[in-house]
Amino acid sequence: MPRVDVGEHSFQYMEEGESSPAILLLCSTGLDSKQWKGLLPHLGGRRVLCPHYLCYPGTDDWKGEGEIDSWMDYRASEALLLAEDGPVDIIGHSYGGFIGLRLAKEHPDRIRRMAFHEPIVWGCLQHTERDDLKNEF
C-alpha cells in the first residue's frame, strides 16, 4: 500500500480505482480500509483513498512524547485531500465523520459532497469558547 508522510510519521493508505472525482473514505476508530470492502464494488471504478490511522497496522506508532497527538490522523487525511487535482467526495463513519467535518470546515472548496454516519460531533466543539454549544452535548 502507498504511504503519506506527516511530520515524523508515515501513514499507510488504501488506494483503488481511477475515475474522478475521488472518494475519501474515513473509517471509524479501531478499523481500517477493510471497513469499506463491501462498498468498493459499488463505486464504479472511482478513485478511492482511505488512510490507516496512527498506530494501526501498516502505519507508524506514535513517536512523540506524552499523549498521542489526535490531530495526526486529521493531517494525514488532509494531505490526501489536498493532493487530489479537484474536489472529492467524503464518506466518514464515527471518528472518520469527525475528521471529515473538520476537513469540510477547513477546506470547503475541496469537498464536492459528503456523507457521514454517526460522526462524533462533540470533537468539533473542542476549540470553541461557546459554552452553550458544549452544554448541549
Short names for language-model regions:
Residues I90-G92, H117:
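Short beta-strand immediately N-terminal to the catalytic nucleophile in serine-hydrolase-like folds
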Residues K105-E106, R110-F137:
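Flexible "cap/lid" loop of the alpha/beta hydrolase fold
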Residues M72-V88:
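Conserved acidic catalytic loop of the alpha/beta-hydrolase fold
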Residues K63-D73:
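Catalytic nucleophile-loop/oxyanion-hole region of alpha/beta-hydrolase
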Residues G92, G96, G100:
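Gly/Ala-rich beta-loop-alpha elbow adjacent to hydrolase catalytic centers
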Residues M1-P2:
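Short, hydrophobic/aromatic-rich segments at coil-to-beta transitions
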Residues G38, R102-E106:
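Active-site signature of alpha/beta-hydrolase-fold catalytic machinery across serine-
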Residues V6-G64, G86:
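Conserved HGGG/HGGXW glycine-rich cap/lid loop of the alpha/beta-hydrolase fold
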